[in-house]
């Protein structure tokens, strides 16, 4: 089971134009700061957040309880000109968990409803014995094939096209994909096998002409899984395996509980 939290800014659209449209550079900076905060605060508890649309953030929160969610929510209220609503859900796959969390928030009203404020709810249950499976995917030799040859925008366009195709293919497995900078993607993919990834990469190569590789990490928390995925990707980059997918798994049952600070200093 994987636990997902959907974070949504309350009534954000109307706020950006009230009483007049706010300066775009300020809005972009504000959205980026919220994403930074969410990663720092969930990350302090071994979680991991993805910006998606900035006004909606998806986080992997295995091991993070309701009280910690409330503290993070209060921190946003105290330091930002808006509030956020949160819903938590768990499921066998990442896509299903975010679907349940999204539906829970939607039950309280529209994202632009001025009376819906600081929702905090749990769709089903908090995960105690679940696991997180993450794939760190990147493009083979993007520097030599794109960055050093094409314009910055054309390289960006190729990366975005690859991202879209990757996301579409992952959804077929009830998984998700998020761009994390450069030519890198982080993919919550509970239940997928190495064979699934190899087949998917072949389809993407045929449609986009892009070669991909992936380190897969399986761990108790998002931090554990992402660290293992990063190491797996380095194994491929360093030529220590002939395969384009490499998996590392944490001995979850042997992991000792560690006490973390409730809040990350910002």
Curated annotation (Swiss-Prot):
Swiss-Prot/TrEMBL keywords: Hydrolase
GO biological process: biosynthetic process
Major enzyme class: hydrolase
Keyword Hydrolase: yes
Enzyme Commission number(s): 3.5.4.29
Any one GO MF annotation of this record: GTP cyclohydrolase IIa activity
Catalytic activity: GTP + 3 H2O = 2-amino-5-formylamino-6-(5-phospho-D-ribosylamino)pyrimidin-4(3H)-one + 2 phosphate + 2 H(+)
Keyword Ligase: no
Cystine bridges: none
Residues making up the signal peptide according to the UniProt record: none
Family: Belongs to the archaeal-type GTP cyclohydrolase family.
HAMAP family: GTP_cyclohydro_3 (MF_00608)
Biological role stated in the UniProt entry: Catalyzes the formation of 2-amino-5-formylamino-6-ribofuranosylamino-4(3H)-pyrimidinone ribonucleotide monophosphate and inorganic phosphate from GTP. Also has an independent pyrophosphate phosphohydrolase activity.
Protein name: GTP cyclohydrolase III
Source organism of the structure: Methanococcus maripaludis (strain C6 / ATCC BAA-1332)
Taxon lineage: Archaea, Methanobacteriati, Methanobacteriota, Methanomada group, Methanococci
Gene name of the record: gch3
